[in-house]
Amino acid sequence: MKWCKQPKIASNLQMPTITQSQLTFESGSKPIRIDAYIPGSNGTSLPAVIALHGAGGDVAGTEKFAAQLAEQGFAVYVLHYFDRTDTQSADKPTILRNFPVWMKTLWDAISFVEKQPAVDRERIALLGFSLGAYLSLANSTIDGRVKAVVEFFGGLPREMRLFMRRLCPTLILHGEADATVPVAEAYNLQQLLEQKSIPYEIKIYPGAGHGFESEVWRDAGQRALHFLQKYLAAS
């Protein structure tokens, strides 16, 4: 997965000081790491974004993106959901076996994040990459605490459509030439959101595969930021 170095919004505002720490919570009696990136807020509750890595298990790129979002005023939490199953990286059989467990881990992570003193519990979004996008979308169909989802080259598991209680505003970002998660997943999700009259935005990048080159990342980063600012705005 390739990451751009600076996918951030040009601004005349001074960037806030970011406090970074690694916290833990319990899920299934196991300690789960969650990396927090908290901007200074003068005591004001902040919108929160929980970020989920992909099947490779490498959080480095996710953490870079988290730090950039925190610079824009979001409390961002990078979830090490593989801790629940002692997974390093996940192939298809591993994903099928553990997906429900990771779903519960994400549910517990939201419960943990909404109790954090810096967080406005009414303004929580999920942001996921690949497998993390699948988990984010699946959770959003049953968890009313999630107000928005940004999904990079993922999709909604077909099984979740049978148990779907809700959907929320969703940003779909996908490569047209994705050979890992076919772009049909993006269009299927778009169709479902339209059928349910749920606000969404979609950008399909011509020629892009699973993971983006720098120029695409810059555009995707801008879109993600604008979407989160729109749907996590203070009421």
List where the protein language model places each region.
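Conserved alpha/beta-hydrolase "acid-adjacent" motif
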Residues: T180-E185
